[in-house]
Amino acid sequence: MGIIIAITGGSGVIYGIKLIESLNSLKLETHLVISEWGEKTIKIETNIDIAYVQKLSTKWYDNKNMAAPISSGSFKTDGMVIIPCSMKTLASIANGFDDNLISRAASVCIKENRKLVVVPRETPLSKIHLENMVKLSELGVSILPAMPGFYFHPSTIDDLLFHIVGKVLDQFGIENNMFNRWGVKR
């Protein structure tokens, strides 16, 4: 069925890019949406071309296309990941304000009881941010902050990135060896 991947304008777009690369290498179906600020942040934070990221997905959609298949509950998916998830997008979803394809697809996942994982990338967090996360968590949304572990002695930035990517894959039951798990020697 496939996983929807949304990249928003929060700092840390490389997490989303690494996730889509990983899903592509696993030959899994993906549906990609990048917000306007997600695209701008990719240009600011990386030397990666947007077209490259789009080509990694099975299908990509314009965030303004509210008629895209992923905007309907009748279009079956395995769920959605918003990585990184800006606080604007988080607030939009938490308050049912479906003003673009990303927030609409997330609302569809909630109403259809499909897996929705948000990877917030903000610090510090205000009470409003935390309340929005609690609201989503109470609806069954997985809140997976971009907070990598250090127990496995990461030596590169990729080690830190793949720790989070591996945790996202775990949320969907996708077997992976992206990071060293606690208590497991490699």
Pin down the residues of each PLM region.
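A cross-family phosphate/adenosyl-ligand binding-site feature
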Residues: 1-117, 123-186
